[in-house]
Amino acid sequence: MPKRAIIPAGSGVPLAPFVPGTLADGVLYVSGTLPFDKDNNVVHVGDAAAQTRHVLEIIKSVIETAGGSMDDVTMNSIFITDWANYGAVNQVYAEYFPGEKPARFCIQCGLVKPDALIEIASIAHLGK
């Protein structure tokens, strides 16, 4: 099965050996996305809603670079550092998925940088 790396224009260099997305057989796998700028600095420190919006904009960019849209998302995996931010995360999340919602899960855990409050990984079905 051939696969293709999806790297939006202006993407920074990841902290580890991975690409923002991989397209294989019509399915786009979007790597865990953190609220980082292109230099891997955490943005919107202390603001879960703004970090969520930043992360979802990056994910949207990856999906659009692959030729899809947020409507193609079938699964989101959400990692948050504090359940107190769950409401703010959901409020922003709902703006990006106003129609039929994709499957998802959300867990509380530590993240790679202490100021990062959220990480999201996505799967989108773009067809063949």
Curated annotation (Swiss-Prot):
The keyword Hydrolase applies. GO terms for cellular component: cytosol. Gene3D superfamilies: RutC-like. Its EC number is 3.5.-.-. It catalyses: (Z)-3-aminoacrylate + H2O + H(+) = 3-oxopropanoate + NH4(+). Pfam families: Ribonuc_L-PSP. Keywords: Hydrolase. InterPro entries: RidA_CS (IPR019897), RutC (IPR019898), RutC-like_sf (IPR035959), YjgF/YER057c/UK114 (IPR006175). Transmembrane segments: none annotated. GO terms for biological process: nitrogen utilization; uracil catabolic process. The keyword Hydrolase applies. GO terms for molecular function: deaminase activity. HAMAP family: RutC. Involved in pyrimidine catabolism. Catalyzes the deamination of 3-aminoacrylate to malonic semialdehyde, a reaction that can also occur spontaneously. RutC may facilitate the reaction and modulate the metabolic fitness, rather than catalyzing essential functions. Belongs to the RutC family. This is 3-aminoacrylate deaminase RutC.
